[in-house]
Amino acid sequence: VFGNLHVWTADTQKSAERKAWLAQLDEMQALKPAVVVPGHMQAGTAMDASAIAYTRDYLQRFEAAAAKAGNSAELIGAMKQAYPQAGMALSLDIGAKVNKGEMPW
């Protein structure tokens, strides 16, 4: 679970892997947790279920943007436009390159 950062996607290179991640996030959300401590977050991120929703929304947007993008630069641009305040740009850079087949992982 991430909080207001670009989500690390280099380890989930296949759509099926990201779908499994989304399913796990759905299970977590269904528990209606009062407190959620993201494993990676910007300072000041709320420690509640909004971090689950953020991670889920990010992964869905990444999936759609990756399908449309012709290369990592296009994917990075789309995600930065969607999440202009998100930190950890290196995560997006590596994840986009790996998922577009431009960097071995």
Question: Model-derived features: where do they sit?
Answer:
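Acidic/histidine-rich, surface-exposed loop or edge segments in extracytoplasmic proteins
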Residues: 3-8, 57-60
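Active-site metal-binding loops of divalent metal-dependent hydrolases
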Residues: 1, 7, 39-42
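Accessory terminal helices/loops
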Residues: 29-35, 42-105
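An active-site-proximal "capping" alpha-helix that borders the catalytic cofactor pocket
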Residues: 12-39
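Second-shell loop/turn segments in exported
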Residues: 8-13, 62-66
